[in-house]
């Protein structure tokens, strides 16, 4: 009988902070051919957007960014470290963002997906 590694589930979420941006950018650069800039993340945090880190223990494995205004939420970014993809972490992040949107009174939630991002299309389908 062989032992197989079990996928790691997110153990907690916490709000993203400015001091997390180096780690966030490292994941962003590994994950996307056209990544957000650190300035975009700074602007999101400065504007008070909901920005959350997904953690396994103390290790950042992904994040999500959500804007909420006028009872509408817009999922701006969901990212999982490529080394951690395929374990359901993106789905956990998306569910957390949906709960956050509802908690803040959003009645509608929008997101856009690039046709070149099959992982996201599969997640949102």
Place the predicted regions along the sequence by residue.
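Aromatic-flanked redox-active Cys/Sec active sites in thiol-based oxidoreductases
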Residues: 80, 113-114
């Amino acid at each position: 009988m062989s032992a197989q590694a079990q996928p790691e589930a997110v153990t907690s979420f916490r709000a993203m902070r400015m001091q997390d941006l180096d780690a966030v950018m490292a994941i962003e650069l590994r994950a996307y051919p056209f990544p957000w800039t650190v300035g975009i993340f700074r602007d999101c945090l400065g504007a008070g957007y909901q920005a959350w880190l997904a953690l396994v223990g103390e290790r950042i494995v992904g994040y999500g960014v959500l804007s909420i205004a006028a009872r509408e939420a817009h999922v701006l970014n969901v990212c999982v470290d490529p080394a951690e993809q395929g374990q359901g972490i993106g789905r956990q992040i998306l569910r957390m963002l949906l709960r956050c949107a509802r908690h803040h009174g959003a009645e509608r939630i929008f997101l856009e997906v690039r046709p070149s991002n099959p992982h996201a299309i599969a997640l949102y389908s």
